[in-house]
Amino acid sequence: MSAARRTGPPAVLLVAFVLGALVLGTGGGRARGSTVARQPQAPAVAGASTTTAAPEAGPEITLALAGDTYFQGVLADRLAADPSTVLEGVRPVLEAADLAVVNLETAVGEGGRPEPKEFAFRAPPTALTALRSAGIDVASMANNHALDHGREALAETLAAERATGFPLVGIGVDEDEAYAPFTTDVRGRRVAVVAATQVLDGSLAAAWTATDGQGGVASARRVERLAAAVREADAGSDTVVVFLHWGVEEQSCPSGDQRELARVMVEAGADVVVGSHAHRVLGGGRLGDAYVHYGLGNFAFHPRDAEAARTGVLELRIGDDGVVGSRWRPGRIEGRLPRLLEGEDAAAELAHWEGLRACTGLRP
């Protein structure tokens, strides 16, 4: 297995990337994984007591995770007007996290032709600028829209990643790159993000799946290949996040396939397993020592109905013992833009979300 890893500096420094000095990713100018710097131990002192103090706990870090994001309709208009303000309404919450991740549900580029499917999405490279400006640090592109405009757009997507320095995960020039994690040091903790999709349109699945000789997206249907990627990420990181495109559209309970895949991911070493695709918010909670959220819902996306307009940001606190705290920040989508709720509205939505856990088999 290739040792290639998409690598970034601490999330708070992502805006300081300079193309040519440091470009995220693997291959074609992408950076290789780096060794985590450890604090040296003090040397033993002759005649001193052999009693050693318990090691100090490392600093906690925070993750912010959100769902399906694209740039159609009013979002395209806002992107054309000013990429830096497209998602300004949720920027404070995303920027406050040490690492923020979303699912980017679109091809990125100007070329290519729409694939033979009902919906084919595309956004210009400034979409990546908009994500960064919103406080987002990395985006999963392991989904059923990443190649909506074919291989020309795939090449443009990867070129946009290199040109902007904004990291994408779950997509690549071959399977090693598609399954490679994004890794970054966050205040002394090494965090890896792996992404894959269970969902690919039947007639396009083979053409879109990354292989040794073909670019595309990481497939979660290749369960052992994905589990191997998670194990490799776990071996070189303190915290592993797996971001999946999975589930059944318009269903608010996880499928059996989702629950089984979550179990496999946790056994492989994932500390956090999240995902989207159903265009519904699903429940979240504990699975063993890990935290699983089966459906983050839409984020910046057109909601077909009131249920699809439910959204939110999952905030997780990570410490020496893994996930030590969680918070669902509920919201509503208005005009394809997410708006986080406050007061009684937030309390009502939070109670609704808590109730969604009942069909997940997860613990609070």
Predicted segments with their positions:
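Acidic, metal/ion-coordinating pockets
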Residues: 3-364
